[in-house]
From Swiss-Prot:
Keyword vocabulary terms for this entry: Phosphoprotein, Two-component regulatory system
Bilayer-crossing regions: none
SMART domains linked to this entry: REC
Organism ancestry: Bacteria, Pseudomonadati, Pseudomonadota, Gammaproteobacteria, Pseudomonadales
Sequence ranges assigned to domain Response regulatory in this UniProt record: 3-119
Keyword Nuclease: no
UniProt protein name: Protein PilH
List of residues that carry 4-aspartylphosphate: 52
Gene that this polypeptide is encoded by: pilH
Keyword Transport: no
GO biological processes: phosphorelay signal transduction system
Role according to the record: May be a part of a signal-transduction system that regulates twitching motility by controlling pilus function (extension and retraction).
Length: 121
């Protein structure tokens, strides 16, 4: 199955997403902020990144832009998973290079379908 990096500063959200993904056989890597997420993505080269937006330090938009503009990580798809549901945030996320944008709380079926679609290309 896929190696998925979750970048989220909420322990509760990290737990929920990890449980959903591991239940379906995915390997989960974790980072609690954007800077650590970018560093871990460069080091581990996950198949996909699930990125929150609101985090201390480097926010999810900034981290997504860094990942998608870096030759080392530009092929790694980023899916934003956040509580921010404004249309302007969705547009901005896509402009930063995110492949998709999901609003929390996200149900398991939607999350898995989105990951599979992004991985399929």
């Amino acid at each position: 199955m896929a190696r998925i990096l979750i970048v989220d500063d909420s322990p509760t959200e990290m737990y929920k997403l990890t449980a959903m993904l591991e239940k379906h056989g995915h390997q989960v890597l974790k980072a609690e902020n954007g800077g650590d997420g970018v560093a871990l993505a460069r080091q581990e080269k996950p198949d996909v990144v699930l990125m929150d937006i609101v985090m201390p330090g480097l926010n999810g938009f900034q981290a997504t832009r860094q990942l998608t503009k870096d030759a080392e990580t530009s092929a790694i798809p980023v899916i934003i998973v956040t509580t921010k549901d404004q249309e302007t945030d969705k547009v901005w996320g896509k402009r930063q290079g995110a492949r998709d944008y999901l609003t929390k709380p996200v149900d398991e079926e939607t999350l898995l379908k989105t990951i599979n679609a992004v991985l399929a290309g």
